[in-house]
Amino acid sequence: MAAANAYPGYQPVRSRWVSRVPEHWSLLRAKNFLREIDDRTKTGEETLLSMRQHRGLVPHNDVSVKRIPPENLIGYKKARPDELVLNRMQAGNAMFFRNRLSGLVSPDYAVFRLLRDDCPEYLGYLFRSWSIRGLFRSESKGLGTGTSGFLRLYSDRFAALEIPLPTRPEQDQIVAYLRAQDAHIARLI
């Protein structure tokens, strides 16, 4: 049995990962709604953040006993709340998160600031979805396959990706739904 359309009209998308989206959604290249930021620490005194698959960005000292002195962090990238952080070597493995804390991340990570009033949490969910992970993997360059290897999603390739974006109220509604589903699943575990 075919599923009913949730929206009155759809537009086709030139993409390998989705064939159509609601006609009122925007189709924007990533560079048109995100700007890559390269702001580096001069002191290394800020909190070092570590990226974890199931927790996102967390203080390094909360997940590791290895302490890193500030002088070793000079040149690391600054990340602020509501910016998005991408581990370029692990984009295809869903290592792309909304940042909730001020701190430092690896100089090899990409830090993005929103150019529009999009929901950063929605974008975090979107960029970790299975479809987008496949797209990121196909756009990455390097050696290896699957979850192993050295595949890097370069900034120019990410910037050129066409991403369908719902309106901000729809983004907020999707995030509320996903939070509720996450809470429901957590209760069952």
Summary of predicted features, one role per range:
Residues 45-65, 84-110, 125, 134-140:
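Short, ligand-facing micro-motifs at secondary-structure edges
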Residues 12-13, 104-106, 155-157:
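Short glycine-enriched loop/turn motifs at secondary-structure junctions
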Residues 29-41, 101, 111-168:
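Basic, amphipathic alpha-helical recognition segments used for DNA target recognition
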Residues 11-14, 28-42, 46-81:
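Sequence-specific dsDNA recognition surfaces
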Residues 2-4:
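N-terminal acidic, proline/glycine-rich, low-complexity intrinsically disordered segments
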Residues 6-41, 164-173, 177-187:
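Non-catalytic DNA-recognition/assembly elements of restriction-modification systems
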Residues 122-126, 177, 188:
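Short amphipathic alpha-helical coupling segments at ligand-binding clamshell hinges
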